[in-house]
Amino acid sequence: MVLSNLIRESYKREGFISVLVFGSQGIGKTSYALHIAHEIYGDWNIALNHLFFNPRDMISLFKRYLRNGERIPLVISDDAGLWLSKSRWWLRDKQEFCEFFDIIRTVCSSIIFTTPSDNLLSRLSHEINLRVKISYIDGEIYEMLKREGISVNPQTYRIAKIYQFSLSPLFQPIIKKRGYDIYPLYYPDEIKERYDKIRRDIVRLKLERVDTSLKSQIEIKCDKTNIDQKILELLSQGYSKSEIARLLGIGRATVYRRLRKLSQMSQ
């Protein structure tokens, strides 16, 4: 496939390619990423082993390759918006990853991010040099493929349109078509079972976090008399001062003022 060839070329010349695969939910973004990884690694299990929902697992792989003085041909950050969403750009872990992304080439030759829309951090998305839009094979595309001697079932195949993104000397975006890939939605059953289990675990974890957050908001709304304690509890749970202000329904200045007061009292 076109994208696989670009990744191989990048690896050989010690370059770096970053890819944003986007499209509606369930259209086949992960299927495309896995097919690309399979072409790169030649093994479905190895391909899946290089797909990550959890950033910690991906960072652990980077550290292992760095210790060995090697570079990873390809990793996949699936549903990257779960932890790299622009809606929470101020969190420290996201800022740290963006800074690491500037030097990622030392340990990684290419990375694919999948997301339903362009909801990644702006600083990160501006540095991604390939965009891939996943689309259904409609009547017009089907006829085009037939003219090129390609016959596929539109129900089980998708088209991945590849665009190169760069900036002009005036920092204006330049979009250039690089080609397209036609690929099947399906892959081996045992790989799908493994992937589905990983995804269910991630969904379960996310639901627990949402439930905990909702319960916290209910408790906060029911009792604002002990607001200093609530601020400290949320701070210990890893929430930023801006997030605490939103959760408690108070201004950021109030959060800073109360924390400063608590600090003075403890001295």
Language model: regions and residue ranges:
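The conserved Walker
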Residues: 24-25, 89
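Short coil turns linking two alpha-helices in DNA-binding domains
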Residues: 240, 251-253
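Short alpha-helical "recognition helix" segments of helix-turn-helix
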Residues: 243-248
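Conserved lysine of the Walker
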Residues: 29
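Pre-Walker A adenine-sensing motif
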Residues: 1-13
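Conserved nucleotide-sensing/catalytic segment adjacent to the nucleotide-binding pocket
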Residues: 55-110
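Short, amphipathic alpha-helical "recognition" segments used to contact nucleic acids or chromatin
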Residues: 221-239, 266
